[in-house]
Amino acid sequence: MRSSVRPVDPSQLLKGVLDLAVLAVLDRADGYGYEVLRGLRAAGLEEVGDASVYGTLRRLYHAGLLTSYVVPSEEGPHRKYYSLNARGRDRLAESTKTWHAFAGTMERLVGA
C-alpha cells in the first residue's frame, strides 16, 4: 500500500507566513516589489515567486497595512514603493508574537 503522507512542502509553509515575511522586509526599509522579492530571497526564501510577492503587496495595501508612493526611475517605468503604516506595524508585531509562539510549539514537538 502506498502512503499518501508526503514530506512537508516548503512552498505550503511559505503561503502561511508570506504576509509576515513581507511586512518584516518592509519594516527594515521601504521598497518596491522587486526589492521586497530580493530581500526575501536574500533571507533564504529562494522559493518565493514574483507573482506571490506582488499579489501580497497589493493585498496588504488594500487591507490598509501599507502606504505607497511613486518614485521616478531613470531605468524604465516609475517605481511604486511600499512602506508600513501604523496598522502595518501593529500587524507585524501581532504576527511576530503568533509566529514565535507557533515556532516554539513546533520546536517542542519535533525537537532541536
Where are these regions (language model features)?
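Short beta-strand/turn micro-motifs at beta-sheet edges
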Residues: V8-Q12, V70-V71
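Beta-hairpin "wing" of winged helix-turn-helix
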Residues: A63-E75, S83
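Short, hydrophobic-biased segments on the C-terminal half of alpha helices
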Residues: Y54-Y61
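N-terminal helix-turn-helix DNA-binding core of bacterial DNA-binding proteins
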Residues: P10-Y54
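Amphipathic alpha-helical dimerization/coiled-coil segments
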Residues: R2-R6, R89-A112
